[in-house]
Amino acid sequence: MKHLLTCCELPKCMLEYEDTLNDYDFVLYHQYLKDETYRNNYLNKRKTHPDRMMILDNSAYEFFVSGEKFIEEDFIRVIKELKPTYYIVPDVLMDYQKTFENFMRWIEIVPTISDSQPYFVPQGRTFDEFMDCAARMSSLIRFNNLPKNFCIPFHNDFFLDRNKLYSTKIKRLIFRRRELTKDEEYAYGRIVLMDKLTSLYPNYTFHMLGSHNPIEIKYYDIFDNIISFDSGYPVKLAISGVKLGEEKEKPNVIIDDFYGTNLSDSVKELIIYNVNKMRDLI
């Protein structure tokens, strides 16, 4: 059975645990810009561990939440400076039009970046918008001979509708007839989406961006081309004092809320417990 690579974004005081808790490095662009310790940590790791997989996130979710302006030229500079294995091409949450406009610009930019591969992120507020965005991207990726890599977001509203439209063995396998929480509905909706996407794009590599509930990773081994998954979910639960599996809902926090905080030993221990429990789901 294949191994799904996982990574949980850790607070600053626990960066030393990255290599033992995570299979690869997931670098948040906005933190890289703001925090010198964070930035130097990954610049040094790139030099000392050049073969370790590294993904540079574009921090679209964090920019969306904060309302701060994303400066594309700075992002390009950071890619060339850090030289990650992969970088995530800028997208706009649930906005098909703006995301596709970004994609069209990046068709010209990608060939100028020789040391890293792109991940492209389809977007859309509805299922049809999302699938149309993915189809148009795929057509141009093929025409321009670009890497066939897709990142799939976790937050799109239409995930909540997928379980109403599809009755599949996947849902029965995961949830065993009980009522789903809203977060589980999001997670199940994305599994159903991946069932569709992996059949339409069998030659693509997929990375799963974030999660509303990491129970979904237990079932990603049925999709051969999903290779990696990132989430702050186990850490956010621990910050809230909750063990993974005992939560009623996903905590409404982002990494910026706790990244620079000096955490107690008990919270650190709970973070380690939650991350390892998530990894055990695979």
Question: Model-predicted segments: where are they?
Answer:
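Alpha/beta catalytic cores of nucleotide-metabolism and tRNA/nucleoside-modifying enzymes
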Residues: 1-16, 73-76, 111, 139, ...
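Non-catalytic, usually N-terminal nucleic-acid engagement modules in DNA/RNA processing proteins
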Residues: 1-112
